[in-house]
């Protein structure tokens, strides 16, 4: 029997692929995402699918906003995927393909086609396979991917809570998993996004205030430098005249 990869094994692989330090503001998110992906990857009922990939890509992009340098951000995502024996290009390509197929759909069309077996394209093929799989392993990241699709199809769902909740229930029923679980995951996801945005705003405001303070101090020093220079020139002129 093969040994199951441990969290420590996965973390070791991750830090072997990405060797640079991770900004402390983002480190907790990265490590929590890594552990979440690891636990799913070793679950016997879990099977990678493009909606899950969209959830991973969306979560990473939303929570890593403002990360610098950009090259490190790319390296971190690549390492996350490689650490669980995944392919970052596949994640990005299939996430993009889902979004492209969702464009132009109405929410009614989306709900009507959900769960139909043998649909064309990556979106309907994925949804059909999930609806027909009695052992489908729902995950929070899958929920984020599904939510991303719904927001792409009907952005007004963000503002219309009743409509959003009803849509989430209908979609969950069609794909045969708990709507309560999905709702709780999405509520937490949106709440954490708000908190992260507030934190980044505070940090940016602090940095901006610090920049203004340094600029002000620099301007205050300039007259002193000019005055000192003029004083020195006057002394030199007096000495030369003597």
Swiss-Prot record:
It comes from Crocosphaera subtropica (strain ATCC 51142 / BH68). The keyword Cell membrane does not apply. Residues 178-209 form a coiled coil. Residues 212-242 are annotated as: Disordered. The gene is thf1. GO terms for cellular component: plasma membrane-derived thylakoid photosystem II. Keywords: Coiled coil. May be involved in photosynthetic membrane biogenesis. The lineage of its organism: Bacteria, Bacillati, Cyanobacteriota, Cyanophyceae, Oscillatoriophycideae. Belongs to the THF1 family. GO terms for biological process: photosystem II assembly. InterPro entries: Thf1. It comes from the Bacteria. Residues 217-235 have a biased composition (Basic and acidic residues). This is Protein Thf1.
């Amino acid at each position: 029997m093969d040994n199951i990869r441990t969290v420590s094994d996965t973390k070791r692989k991750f830090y072997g692929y990405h060797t640079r330090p991770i900004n402390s503001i983002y480190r907790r998110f990265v490590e929590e995402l890594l552990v979440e992906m690891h636990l799913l990857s070793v679950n016997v009922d879990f099977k990678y699918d493009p909606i899950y990939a969209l959830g991973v890509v969306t979560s990473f992009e939303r929570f890593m906003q403002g990360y610098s340098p950009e090259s490190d951000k790319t390296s971190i995502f690549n390492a996350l995927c490689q650490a669980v024996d995944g392919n970052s290009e596949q994640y990005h390509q299939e996430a993009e393909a889902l979004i492209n197929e969702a464009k132009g759909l109405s929410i009614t069309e989306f709900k009507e086609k959900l769960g139909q077996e043998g649909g064309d394209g990556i979106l309907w093929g994925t949804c059909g396979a999930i609806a027909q799989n009695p052992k489908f392993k729902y995950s929070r990241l899958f929920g984020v991917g599904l939510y991303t699709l719904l927001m792409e199809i009907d952005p007004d769902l963000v503002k219309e809570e009743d409509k959003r909740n009803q849509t989430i229930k209908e979609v969950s029923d069609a794909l045969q998993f708990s709507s309560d679980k999905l709702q709780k995951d999405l509520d937490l996801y949106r709440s954490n996004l708000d908190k992260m945005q507030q934190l980044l705003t505070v940090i940016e405001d602090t940095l901006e205030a610090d920049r203004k303070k340094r600029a002000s101090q620099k301007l205050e020093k300039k007259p002193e430098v000019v005055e000192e220079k003029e004083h020195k020139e006057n002394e030199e002129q007096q000495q030369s005249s003597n």
